[in-house]
């Protein structure tokens, strides 16, 4: 997603992932007490450069994040809740309650960021095989889509809204990339079948054991979609016109455990969840070649999954997926670090 404040976040329910895996100009929010439906942001420990946003609730295990302007949204894999916060403000609250509209789990999330279009929030539903579309301001349900596959055959992991308004959804289990045309979203379609945009069968993008297609973004010149394969660390380019699938040439580098991604101008940020870092990739405008130019990490990172760019900072979800079934540190958090 090539814009200043978006995410592609990417993603998976924690146990499945493990098997395969604020604006710099904004004031730092002050600490405040966490409540049942609202939590706060605080300045991180001296060993960290991050500002920390606390998520309300217990057992959240967050995954996806997206942002438009200074508003950000975070998903919960545990019950499908979606939280909303404002960069520079201490309060993060429940925007969409868990379980509503059959949303029992939520993974990747994206939001439109175009003054000429309505503000839509799109949520990939993991093993449910569903995608939900909401009004990003009111929280009203707009449309729903499904691939009709069983929970053992699909995992809708991440979603990216392209510049033309169409949405693209990755599936970590089934070798397909889905497209949701913008006109179907506007029409308020309910339980519509997901359209397979590209089947990866017979292409260089070979599915194997573990998690496959994960994070997705639109490239800088909007000619293609870029998808990371978690299990191999390979990056793939899907041409939006010809639908040709090719591997991005990273000069021999790989992005193992690649999860959520964010495109900010010509810099691609790739979260490598198990490795606790974000890789910076200088990607050419056409998305065919790139080079890993650096890494970002912070003491506050705790199995990071997805990232959203807001001005000169990155909002990073700390999923603690490695603590599922154990003792996670609560509250769950989002870190805001410099790019």
Predicted regions mapped to residue ranges:
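Short loop/turn segments that connect beta-strands within beta-propeller blades
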Residues: 86-90, 135-140, 181-185, 239-244, ...
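Short, low-complexity, disordered segments immediately C-terminal to signal peptides
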Residues: 12-16, 21-46
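Bacterial N-terminal signal peptides that target proteins for export
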Residues: 1-10
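Beta-rich, blade/repeat-based domains predominating
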Residues: 56-71, 100-122, 148-167, 202-224, ...
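Blade-level signature of beta-propeller repeat domains, shared across WD40, Kelch, NHL, RCC1
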Residues: 306-339
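A short helix->beta-strand "capping" segment at the edge of beta-propeller domains
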Residues: 41-59, 290-294, 337-338
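Conserved beta-strand positions in repeat-built beta-propeller and related beta-rich domains
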Residues: 73-79, 114, 118-127, 167-173, ...
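Hydrophobic alpha-helical segments and helix pairs
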Residues: 133-196
């Amino acid at each position: 997603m090539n814009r200043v404040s978006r995410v592609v976040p990417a993603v998976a329910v924690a146990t499945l992932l493990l098997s395969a895996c604020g604006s710099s100009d904004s004031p730092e929010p002050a600490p405040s007490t966490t409540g049942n439906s609202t939590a706060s942001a605080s300045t991180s420990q001296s060993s960290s450069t991050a500002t920390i946003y606390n998520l309300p609730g217990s057992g959240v295990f967050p995954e996806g994040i997206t942002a438009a302007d200074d508003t950000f949204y975070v998903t919960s894999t545990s019950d499908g809740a979606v939280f909303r916060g404002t960069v520079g403000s201490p309060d993060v609250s429940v925007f969409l309650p868990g379980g509503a509209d059959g949303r029992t789990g939520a993974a990747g999330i994206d939001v439109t960021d175009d003054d000429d279009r309505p503000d839509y929030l799109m949520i990939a539903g993991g093993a449910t095989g569903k995608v939900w579309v909401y009004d990003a301001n009111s929280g009203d349900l707009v449309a729903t889509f499904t691939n009709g596959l069983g929970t053992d055959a699909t995992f809708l992991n991440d979603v990216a809204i392209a510049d033309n308004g169409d949405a693209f959804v990755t599936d970590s289990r089934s070798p397909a990339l889905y497209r949701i045309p913008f006109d179907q979203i506007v029409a308020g379609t309910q339980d519509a079948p997901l359209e397979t945009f590209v089947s990866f069968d017979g292409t260089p993008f070979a599915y194997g054991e573990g998690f496959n297609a994960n994070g997705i973004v639109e490239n800088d010149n909007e000619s293609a979609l870029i998808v990371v394969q978690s299990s191999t660390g390979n990056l793939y380019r899907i041409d939006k016109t010809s639908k040709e699938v090719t591997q991005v040439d990273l000069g021999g580098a790989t992005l193992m455990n690649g999860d959520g991604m964010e495109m900010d101008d010509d810099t691609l940020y790739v979260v490598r969840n198990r490795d606790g870092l974000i890789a910076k990739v200088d990607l050419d405008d056409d998305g065919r070649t790139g080079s890993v130019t650096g890494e970002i990490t912070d003491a506050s990172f705790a199995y990071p999954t997805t990232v959203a760019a807001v001005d000169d900072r990155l909002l990073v979800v700390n999923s603690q997926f490695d603590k599922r079934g154990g003792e996670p540190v609560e509250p769950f958090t989002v870190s805001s670090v410099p790019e």
